């Protein structure tokens, strides 16, 4: 059966956000509320996942907050800031939502409520941009000709925003590979999710995460 690692009360739903520089989001929706210690553990899980999947040796970990100053946010987020600062992770401080698309971190940490809102907003903005570009390019003959001139670069740009290649959203912190996908997911997404789960098993990512949680020391509380 599937269970959380020893010493871990809550697993985190993770997602790779495919922007100009992809980053890992943890938690992306599993826990609407999370205490400071859980946020610290989500950060460690996200760090290991980022190393394994994105190949970042020392991921920059940021805490999503309503300001960059250490004293910003709720009591829980201020406590989490202290725990992350005292940890051995490459913690770069708080990060505001507006900065996420610009490569300020490799791992973005938050509770599942915040993470899910951010993910859905990014998805919506992606659709908004796509529909807007199509509308502008198809407006008249001049814009259609302009669209032909930039077609290749636009395709590259849109490909960079495609999340289907990453599969689904893995549940981090449990003993077996579990990947969540939408019920209306495309064939490409389903295939990528199967490959993703198989990769977890072959590369023993779950075991590495269990070791990471077991070795995590808590100071600064």
Residue ranges of each PLM-predicted region?
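Glycine-rich phosphate/nucleotide-binding loop
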Residues: 1-12, 16-25, 104-108, 112-220
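Glycine-rich phosphate/diphosphate-binding loop of Rossmann-like nucleotide-binding domains
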Residues: 32-97, 106
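Short glycine-rich or small-residue beta-strand-to-loop segments that form or flank ligand, phosphate
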Residues: 24-31, 60-67, 177-182
């Amino acid at each position: 059966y599937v269970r959380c690692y020893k010493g871990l009360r809550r697993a985190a739903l993770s997602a790779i956000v495919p922007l100009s520089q992809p980053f890992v989001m943890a938690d992306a929706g599993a826990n609407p509320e999370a205490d400071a210690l859980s946020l610290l553990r989500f950060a460690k899980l996200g760090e290991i996942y980022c190393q394994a999947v994105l190949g970042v040796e020392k991921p920059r970990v940021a805490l999503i907050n309503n300001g960059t100053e250490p004293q910003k946010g709720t009591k829980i987020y201020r406590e989490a800031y202290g725990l992350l600062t005292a940890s051995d992770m490459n913690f770069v401080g708080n990060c505001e939502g507006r900065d996420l698309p610009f490569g300020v971190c490799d791992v973005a940490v938050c509770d599942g409520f915040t993470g899910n809102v951010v993910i859905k907003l990014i998805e919506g903005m992606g659709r908004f941009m796509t529909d807007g570009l199509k509308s502008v390019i198809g407006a008249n003959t001049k814009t259609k000709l302009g669209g032909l001139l930039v077609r290749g670069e636009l395709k590259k740009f849109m490909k960079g925003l495609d999340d289907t290649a990453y599969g689904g959203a893995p549940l981090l912190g449990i003993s077996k590979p579990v990947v969540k996908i939408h019920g209306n997911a495309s064939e490409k997404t389903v295939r990528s999710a199967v490959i993703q789960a198989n990769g977890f098993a072959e590369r023993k990512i779950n075991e590495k995460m269990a070791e990471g949680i077991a070795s995590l020391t808590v100071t600064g509380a």
